[in-house]
């Protein structure tokens, strides 16, 4: 009856922790976001230096959006932490909007992961009668590989590779 679960709209919330009063905002996460917000509010320019890739772009954009920041930003793109690579990246800063497609891809993947994980896990829990099972895009095939390797090890039969003969 509860499926599919499709939030409208998707909302980001600060990490929550379970307490005796229920779920509450993680104090450390809230404090860190406050610091980032103060830095963004007080700066003249923003250079994004998160990991070069979808996930790094997503992390920055989610924080940027959550804080309601509207300042333009530049992107520092490098995949090595050598002085030379960082200097080269700083000399070649790109406009933030050039990475909008990368962000959209990461955001879509994150939402799809949530939809598949939550709905498939709920369906599995309903069908199996156990709420202790979960399904995920990466988790499920990884677990399948671990299980296959476990079975392979358990069923392993030792055989000699060579025999010694004395002549």
Predicted regions and their residues:
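Intrinsically disordered, low-complexity regulatory segments
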Residues: 1-110, 114-118, 141
């Amino acid at each position: 009856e509860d499926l599919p679960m499709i939030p409208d709209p998707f909302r980001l919330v600060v990490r929550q922790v379970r307490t005796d009063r229920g779920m509450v905002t993680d104090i450390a996460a809230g404090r860190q976001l406050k610091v980032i917000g103060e830095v963004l509010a007080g700066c003249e320019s923003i250079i994004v230096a998160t990991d070069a890739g979808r996930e790094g772009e997503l992390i920055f954009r989610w924080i940027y959006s959550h804080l309601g920041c509207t300042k333009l930003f530049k992107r520092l793109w490098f995949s090595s932490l050598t002085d030379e690579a960082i200097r080269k990246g700083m000399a070649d800063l790109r406009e933030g909007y050039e990475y909008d497609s990368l962000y959209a891809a990461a955001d879509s993947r994150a939402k799809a992961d949530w939809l598949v994980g939550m709905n498939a896990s709920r369906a599995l829990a309903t069908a199996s009668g156990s709420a202790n099972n979960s399904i995920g895009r990466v988790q499920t095939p990884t677990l399948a590989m671990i299980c296959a390797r476990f079975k392979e090890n358990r069923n392993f039969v030792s055989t000699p590779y060579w025999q010694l003969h004395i002549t």
